[in-house]
Structure formats: structure tokens, C-alpha cells
């Protein structure tokens, strides 16, 4: 069965894997999910990710990051723009997540980037999700 919201599926697999204390989670690959994984790694929310080729679309293997007491690096994830209700924001309307303690991920004309990068470059776009 096809997934109606692949980004929400990506975020939920990471969240559920962290709650179940898995070391890694396998997710069906796409370019957008690879970009999201790259941002999560750069911001320190996941340890690493690896693209694995297979006969179909490929797999992204995400290594989940934990603290010294096995608490997850991700406290919360919220999907903002959904297929049924898209949310677009200008560069001056991008909200700060947890007063700057979290990140917002924005899909812009220059690619997928964090809320800080979008504000710095002065471009808005679709607000995909918030992570803290």
C-alpha cells in the first residue's frame, strides 16, 4: 500500500525507532528524505545515515543518536505542512522553534534547508516540520 505522506512516515519511523531504543532504522529512500537526513545529521539529531541501493527505490539507514543515559537526541517532532493543508511562509514569517532551541525545516526554491538558513538567505517556502 502506498504511503500518502512520505515525510510524516520518515519522521514517525525515526521517532518510533528512538522510543523503541533501536540503533538504526531503515526507511524507503527518496531525494527529499536524503536531504532531511542530511539536515538532521548536520544539526546533531541523528548519528549518521547511509544510502543503500537495492532493486527498487533504495533504503536510507538512519543511525539514531542517544545521550549517555540512553535518552534520545530528538525530544519532539511535529509535521507542519501536510498534503491536505500546505503551509507556506515568507522569510520574515518563519517561526522560531522553541525560541531557537529547535529547528524548522523549510523547502525552498534553493532546496531543503533549516529555518535559520532560510532567514539568512532571505527566502521563504513550505514549512515541512519542526524538530526539537
UniProtKB/Swiss-Prot annotation:
Signal peptide: none annotated. Keywords: Ribonucleoprotein, Ribosomal protein, RNA-binding, rRNA-binding. The keyword Ribosomal protein applies. One of its GO terms (cellular component) is ribosome. Belongs to the universal ribosomal protein uS8 family. It comes from Syntrophobacter fumaroxidans (strain DSM 10017 / MPOB). GO terms for biological process: translation. Part of the 30S ribosomal subunit. Contacts proteins S5 and S12. It comes from the Bacteria. This is Small ribosomal subunit protein uS8. One of its GO terms (molecular function) is structural constituent of ribosome. One of the primary rRNA binding proteins, it binds directly to 16S rRNA central domain where it helps coordinate assembly of the platform of the 30S subunit.
Amino acid at each position: 500500500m502506498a504511503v500518502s505522506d512520505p515525510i510524516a512516515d520518515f519522521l514517525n519511523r525515526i521517532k518510533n525507532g528512538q522510543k523503541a531504543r533501536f540503533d538504526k532504522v531503515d526507511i524507503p529512500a527518496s531525494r527529499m528524505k536524503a536531504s532531511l537526513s542530511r539536515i538532521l545529521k548536520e544539526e546533531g539529531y541523528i548519528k549518521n545515515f547511509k544510502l543503500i541501493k537495492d532493486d527498487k527505490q533504495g533504503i536510507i539507514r538512519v543511525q539514531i543518536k542517544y545521550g549517555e543515559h540512553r535518552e534520545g537526541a530528538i525530544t519532539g517532532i511535529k509535521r507542519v505542512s501536510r498534503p491536505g493543508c500546505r503551509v507556506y511562509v515568507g522569510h520574515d514569517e518563519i517561526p522560531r522553534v522553541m525560541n531557537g532551541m529547535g529547528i524548522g525545516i523549510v523547502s525552498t526554491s534553493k532546496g531543503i534547508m533549516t529555518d535559520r538558513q532560510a532567514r539568512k538567505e532571505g527566502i521563504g517556502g513550505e514549512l515541512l516540520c519542526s524538530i526539537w
